[in-house]
């Protein structure tokens, strides 16, 4: 029988990692009104817990409002989130928009509905953020989501592009933040199990998960099993980009490159990989073990 860990032990490293990401990317500032998008999954529940904790202890004042979108999926348990959020004492809005019918009508039989569903959901949430005066929209994407997106774009889109911790929304009127960007999914999952969150299944619509994303996710899980710490190193590499050692002519002027009296880059020197030193230092920031 699997023993459930104490959430009070699992929570502090998660808070520390999220606080570091928030600080590094200046995600939350004085006077912000943060709209937390709550799906009923482990990630968004954990995100809400962390932000409510930081709200009480951070040296700045910011508001937190939880928002859930009921998309009309059959079997959606409408009572779960209102009851949970009421007990928690956090301000919340439940939006009701029947995007399920639209998605079913527009998506061919057998095809995944996730892309269209996501676009419709995003538009509704952006609009609501404007209506309530939210200055930031907080999403529950974590480290593993970011890395899956990176490799999805490389393998199937031929683009070096991931999922940023902070960005301007595509409608140009909102700022989206991902405070869980530094956190591993397995650590969030352990905490969610320990807390016993009332999880709402994400497959109520009957859509099958994206096969390509599932394959990439399994690949990353395999890497981490065989080489613990590899995923954290890949994430860190996204913060240490050297354009002169890539092939993008828009990022680096290869055509204009010429010999100068200044010292050139050390492209032919041996690389140094202080992996263990880095992981040892980071283990104090997030749960890596």
From Swiss-Prot:
Cofactor: binding comment: Binds 1 [4Fe-4S] cluster per subunit. The cluster is chelated by three Cys residues, the fourth Fe has a free coordination site that may bind a sulfur atom transferred from the persulfide of IscS.
Reaction(s) the record says it catalyses: cytidine(32) in tRNA + S-sulfanyl-L-cysteinyl-[cysteine desulfurase] + AH2 + ATP = 2-thiocytidine(32) in tRNA + L-cysteinyl-[cysteine desulfurase] + A + AMP + diphosphate + H(+)
GO molecular function term, any single one: 4 iron, 4 sulfur cluster binding
NCBIfam families assigned to the protein according to its UniProt record, in alphabetical order: PRK10696.1
Pathway as given in its UniProt record: tRNA modification
Family, as annotated: Belongs to the TtcA family.
UniProt keyword annotations, A-Z: 4Fe-4S, ATP-binding, Cytoplasm, Iron, Iron-sulfur, Magnesium, Metal-binding, Nucleotide-binding, RNA-binding, Transferase, tRNA processing, tRNA-binding
Organism: Deinococcus geothermalis (strain DSM 11300 / CIP 105573 / AG-3a)
Comment field (misc): The thiolation reaction likely consists of two steps: a first activation step by ATP to form an adenylated intermediate of the target base of tRNA, and a second nucleophilic substitution step of the sulfur (S) atom supplied by the hydrosulfide attached to the Fe-S cluster.
Name the record gives this protein: tRNA-cytidine(32) 2-sulfurtransferase
UniProt xrefs under SUPFAM superfamilies: Adenine nucleotide alpha hydrolases-like
Assembly description: Homodimer.
GO cellular component term of the entry, any: cytoplasm
Localization, UniProt: Cytoplasm
Primary site of residence: cytoplasm
């Amino acid at each position: 029988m699997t023993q459930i860990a104490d959430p009070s032990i699992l929570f502090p490293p998660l808070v520390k990692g999220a606080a570091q990401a928030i600080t590094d990317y200046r995600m939350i500032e004085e006077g912000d009104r943060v709209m937390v998008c709550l799906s009923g999954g482990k990630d968004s529940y954990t995100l809400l817990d962390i932000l409510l904790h930081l709200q009480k202890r951070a040296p700045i004042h910011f508001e937190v409002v939880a928002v859930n979108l009921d998309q009309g999926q059959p079997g959606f348990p409408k009572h779960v989130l209102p009851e949970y959020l009421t007990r928690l004492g956090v301000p919340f809005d439940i939006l009701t928009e029947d995007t399920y019918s639209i998605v079913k009508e527009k998506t061919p039989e057998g095809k995944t509905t996730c892309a269209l569903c996501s676009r419709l959901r995003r538009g509704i949430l952006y609009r609501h953020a404007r209506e309530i005066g939210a200055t930031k929209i907080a999403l529950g994407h974590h480290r593993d989501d970011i890395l899956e997106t990176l490799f999805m774009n490389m393998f199937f889109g031929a683009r070096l592009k991931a999922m940023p911790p902070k960005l301007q929304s595509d409608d140009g009127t909102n700022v989206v933040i991902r405070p869980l960007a530094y956190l591993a999914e397995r650590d969030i999952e352990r905490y969610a199990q320990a807390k016993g969150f009332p999880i709402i299944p994400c497959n109520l619509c009957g859509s099958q998960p994206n096969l390509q994303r599932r394959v990439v996710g399994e690949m990353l899980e395999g890497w981490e099993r065989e080489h613990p710490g590899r995923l954290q190193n890949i994430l860190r590499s996204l913060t240490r980009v050297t354009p002169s050692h890539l092939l993008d002519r828009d990022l680096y002027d290869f055509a204009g490159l010429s010999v100068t009296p200044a010292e050139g880059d050390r492209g032919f020197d041996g690389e140094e990989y202080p992996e263990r030193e880095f992981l040892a230092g980071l283990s104090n920031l997030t749960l890596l073990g």
